[in-house]
From Swiss-Prot:
K(+) binds at E44. It comes from Francisella tularensis subsp. holarctica (strain LVS). The lineage of its organism: Bacteria, Pseudomonadati, Pseudomonadota, Gammaproteobacteria, Thiotrichales. Catalyzes the formation of S-adenosylmethionine (AdoMet) from methionine and ATP. The overall synthetic reaction is composed of two sequential steps, AdoMet formation and the subsequent tripolyphosphate hydrolysis which occurs prior to release of AdoMet from the enzyme. This is S-adenosylmethionine synthase. ATP binds at H16, D165, A166, K167, D240, R246, K247, A263, K267. GO terms for molecular function: ATP binding; magnesium ion binding; methionine adenosyltransferase activity. The gene is metK. L-methionine binds at E57, Q100, D240, K271. InterPro entries: ADOMET_SYNTHASE_CS, S-AdoMet_synt_C, S-AdoMet_synt_central, S-AdoMet_synt_N, S-AdoMet_synthetase, S-AdoMet_synthetase_sfam. It comes from the Bacteria. Binds 2 divalent ions per subunit. Binds 1 potassium ion per subunit. Its EC number is 2.5.1.6. Pathway: Amino-acid biosynthesis; S-adenosyl-L-methionine biosynthesis; S-adenosyl-L-methionine from L-methionine: step 1/1. GO terms for cellular component: cytoplasm.
């Protein structure tokens, strides 16, 4: 890739139909983990006009009122009137949940957490870069900020005409591999009938864009596409069917890193799609925080029923202060990559997952997000002797 280029990432709001589905799946997971930390959960959700379907495989001693939980998530997200695409109080809720296959369970459940086997085969990636304060790529970082601001203004009532469904997209111009300015901002937001397109355009620029995007990244040539198709009244599940796991690039690094293909929401941490990806982020972030590299991608891969990974790879894209092979050896020494130890060390059996389902699983330094800690940075730096 040339050192001068444009790079784009997107984010979506919590009212986007796919994110509504993610929230429902993770809310169910959380409620189960509150009662049963040993539960096996793989929960998928589909939302469409007037209905929500929950399906999957769950083995647990917990009892959860699935229907009530689904309704609460939908209304809390802002869908409390049929005119918005779905009303959580009156929509149909269909439950098609079964139990985890015995064939899978026999390979995963080994008694002690230390011996826990991976819930499936798969490959996962973690990534970090020193472009932003949270060590996330710039385009996804600013896209998430735009969507969080949209939600804040909607919930506070400051822009009362906003509705839950929205998307943002940011294009960064890079020079010598460093982000220099924003070339294009795209933001589409659902709204009610009371607002004109000019009023909406001006309010989005003044109250959303200018409040979260640093002035130094905006130039006279920065292009804005605000609700570029015009009216956006029909949104949410009425506009598009929503499914769990369809926003995996929004959930991770906005396309700036590889993705193993596995979604996160609705899965307990024995599923390495989730826990392995969280560990990958933890490793990559600590490597960059330690100053071992400006940019780092980590790949891990697992076999179903096997505790240890089958492979580990580190790529610093030529920015490493020591070789990638040397960093790999340090990672193997400092981090325990057995599935059970990942769960234990990152404390992943807590009911924290609904918080992850919006605005990215990475880059928000919340107390619950243990994979965002940089507590191994000093250890890595000392071991690398840099």
């Amino acid at each position: 890739m040339s050192k001068n280029y444009l790079f784009t990432s997107e984010s979506v709001s919590e009212g986007h139909p796919d994110k509504l589905a993610d929230q429902i799946s993770d809310a169910i997971l959380d409620e189960i983990l509150k009662q049963d930390k040993n539960a096996r959960v793989a929960c998928e959700t589909l939302v469409k006009t007037g209905m929500a379907l929950v399906a999957g495989e769950i083995t647990t001693s917990a009892w959860v009122d699935i229907e009530e939980l689904v309704r609460n998530v939908i209304t809390e997200t802002g869908y409390d009137n049929a005119s918005k695409g779905i009303d959580g109080r009156t929509c149909s809720v269909i439950n098609a949940i079964g139990k985890q296959s015995r064939d899978i369970a026999q390979g995963v459940d080994r008694g002690s957490l230390e011996d826990l086997g991976a819930g499936d085969q798969g490959l996962m990636f973690g990534f970090a870069t020193n472009e932003t304060p949270t060590l996330m790529p710039s385009a996804i970082y600013y896209s998430h900020l735009l969507m969080r601001k949209q939600a804040e203004l909607r919930k506070s009532g400051k822009l009362a005409w906003l509705r839950p469904d929205a998307k943002a997209q940011v294009t960064l111009a890079y020079e010598n591999d460093k982000p220099k300015f924003i070339d294009t901002i795209v933001l589409s937001t659902q709204h009610n009938e009371s607002i004109s397109q000019k009023e909406l355009h001006d309010a989005v620029i003044e109250e959303i864009v200018k409040k979260v995007i640093p002035n130094e990244l905006i130039t006279k040539d920065t292009k804005y596409h605000i609700n570029p198709t015009g009216v956006f009244l029909i949104g949410g599940p009425q506009g598009d069917c929503g499914l769990t796991g369809r926003k995996i690039i929004v959930d991770t690094y906005g396309g700036a890193a590889h993705h193993g293909g596995g979604a996160f929401s609705g899965k307990d941490p024995s599923k390495v799609d989730r826990s392995g990806a969280y560990m990958g982020r933890y490793i990559a972030k600590n490597i960059v925080a330690a100053g071992l590299a400006d940019k780092c991608e980590v790949q891990v891969a697992y076999a179903i029923g096997v505790a240890k990974p089958v492979s580990l790879m580190v790529n610093t894209f030529g920015t490493g202060k020591i070789t990638d092979n040397q960093i790999e050896k340090l990672v193997a020494e400092v981090f325990d990559l057995r599935v059970g130890k990942i769960i234990e060390n990152l404390d992943l059996l807590r009911p924290i997952y609904r918080k992850t389902s919006n605005y990215g699983h990475f880059g928000r330094e919340l107390p619950e997000f243990t994979w965002e800690k940089i507590d191994k940075a000093d250890i890595l730096k000392s071991a690398a002797r840099i």
